[in-house]
Amino acid sequence: MRAYLAITPPELQRFMDSGSFKAARAWIVNQIQSGDFETDSEEELEFESSLQAAMQSRVMQGPNALGMALAVDLTIEQIGAIAENQVGVLSDLLWSQVQSLLLSESDEPELSWFAAQEIPTYLAQWLA
């Protein structure tokens, strides 16, 4: 299951360094959420979930911070209770589960996409 984790730059650094990360919850696309939007496009629903995670990242850090949504693929064993558009994460995530990072630089509904392999290249800039 694809999920989007709200994460801060220091947390991202620790995740990369250790190879694992404990997350309590993540944002997902599910049938309930699908009915909330006037689209059938899976891509648009994925965007909404990733944007919600990125906005939560900004809330965790402060209004002028970068919002980060880490796209991860959860295993069946990691999927906890699902409530609306969020899922509980039952065990640590591994860096190998990371697919990409979506970055919000403003209050606008726009996200920049970075492949997992690009994250180390930009991390120092995001930490500054």
PLM regions: where:
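Residue-level detector of solvent-exposed, low-hydrophobicity positions
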Residues: E11, I28, S34, E44, ...
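Glycine-rich, aromatic-bearing surface loops/beta-hairpins
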Residues: Q61, A65-A128
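Structured domain cores in non-transmembrane regions
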Residues: Q31-P63
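Long, hydrophobic N-terminal alpha-helical segment
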Residues: M1-D40
